Amino acid sequence: MKVITILEPGKVEITEKEMPEVKEGEALLKILYGGICGSDLGTYRGTFAYASYPRIPGHEFSAQIVEIGENDRGLKPGMIVTCNPYFNCQRCYSCERGLVNCCETNETMGAQRDGAFSEYITMPVERIYDGMGLNPRQLALIEPFCISYHGVSRADIKKGDKVLVIGAGTIGVLAAVAAKAKGGEVYIADIAEEKLQYAYKTFGFAGMIKNDSEESLANSVSQITGEHHGFDVCIEAVGLPSTFQNCMDAAAYGGRIVLIGVGKKNLDFNFTLIQKKELSIFGSRNALKADFKELIELVKCGGIDLEKIVMNKGCADAAKRSEYELEEAAAAFEEFHQYGGSKLKVLIHFSDPSEITEHNR
């Protein structure tokens, strides 16, 4: 079978690998669509904190069940599904308290272990979720929405809260969508004009901020919230020291800050600002089983049009293209790297669903 492998920073190849062996308690899945996450792109660039090589990327995906044994989940061959890609130990202190998303030895597909960018993978049955009739593109977008939704939930947003999301990539935009759904008055900031305009117009946020300098951001914060007020909630969805500092500067006294972005660099800052403003700062990692189930249902009911996160559908221009075939994986990564300012989510099409009529194993 064909497998996408990042051999080293800047080098993607399609390699051949044996079909995986299905073990007890696992299912064989055929991958349909995969989304290139910011962490996958970071692995390609050599900037992701958890990167190692060679690595099969991919933890945002939809799949079709090919083989599955008897189970109590109602899962059968032929079903279109998505999966929880965070492997936890179930033994550490975090797992014992139900905080499996921040397991001390967590292994996320495509990061600490090989990912889903293969024609076929095996997956423990308990990590597979019925797609509830959503199409394969939608299901490939559920996992990043879960990341954003989980982070936003940490902020305890109340109706009318002024919310600033810094970062107009996939995670940032979906965080803004989630914050709006929770009743927030949402503003989104970024340096990439095209993505910023698209997100603002497409999802109907209260406003947008071109975050091209500290002065520009400060002026916008004052105009929106009133002089010396600031935002009730700031969500960092980039992973840079500068954007974390932006959040502390933009937050109101008594404000809440959530860090979703993942970075490698240390930040030298005046920590007295946290004490002075009495800021509450929350980390956010991965997502929970409940997030997946809740958001599949939300999208099914029409609450969110997830496919809008894919810009320029059908466009063949390398600078704007957002969908690629498996054989074009190297181009997908390189063009996302080169033209990230004009792309939100990039999808790779692996295969279409097929008629599967075999009985459960």
Q: Can you name each region flagged by the protein language model?
A:
Residues K201-S280, I356:
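Glycine-rich cofactor phosphate-binding loops and adjacent beta1-alpha1 units
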Residues L134-S213:
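Mid-domain Rossmann-like dinucleotide-binding core that forms the NAD(H)/NADP(H) cofactor-binding site
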